[in-house]
Each structure stands twice: as C-alpha cells, then as structure tokens.
Amino acid sequence: MNDTTKPLFGTADASYQAAGELAGIQQLVTDFYQIMDTWSGATKIRAMHKSDLSQSADKLTCFLSGWLGGPRLYQERYGSISIPGFHAQWPIDAQARDAWLGCMQQAIERQPFSADFKGYLLAQLSVPA
C-alpha cells in the first residue's frame, strides 16, 4: 500500500488497526500500568488508583478501543463516558497530567507501532489530558 492509499490515522478504524487492534491496545495498557507501578515520576497518579489495577486496565483498554475507531467496548461494559466528568473524581493538576503522559509516552515507545503512529497517538492523547 503506498502513501496515497494508506488510511489516515483518526479516520474509520485506521488508528485501531495501527495499534494492533485489541491485542495491541491490551499490551499498551499493560505496559502503561506497569510503568505507573514502577516509575518514580508516577507516584502521585499511582496513589489515585486502587492497589488492584485490573479494572482500571480494563476500562482504559475498552475506552481506547472505541476512541481509536475499534469496537466501543467501554460503552458496552460500563456505559457512556465523559472525559471531563470521569477525571473530576481526581485532583488532576499539571504534575499529574504530565506524569500520566510520561507513563503513556514510555508505554507507546515499547510498542511495535510505526514511528508515525507513535507520534500521532501521543499527540492525540495529549489533547484530553
């Protein structure tokens, strides 16, 4: 497939495909929470979560699936979501935002995604953060 026929990230399911579909998203989320658990820069945001991260991981996986153009698993399992409303339950400041993005940046770098998709994904995740 050449550049003129390659789907653009953010259209249809191009981002979902670029992420490796559900298995790729699950690996990204697994790495994200592993980094959050071990990186000293994430201590503040790790404390905002329960000790068992399995539900948080499932919710993030489900959210990212739909957000990237794949199956809307979050809505199926948990109902509708409003990002500002969801985040209102925590005292998120610039330090917490930067820690979350730092964990995600490190997790993205571990993935076998294309360099273009890595840059795109981090930029898009920075918008709601």
Placement of each model-derived feature along the sequence:
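Core of compact, soluble alpha-helical bundle domains
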Residues: 1-129
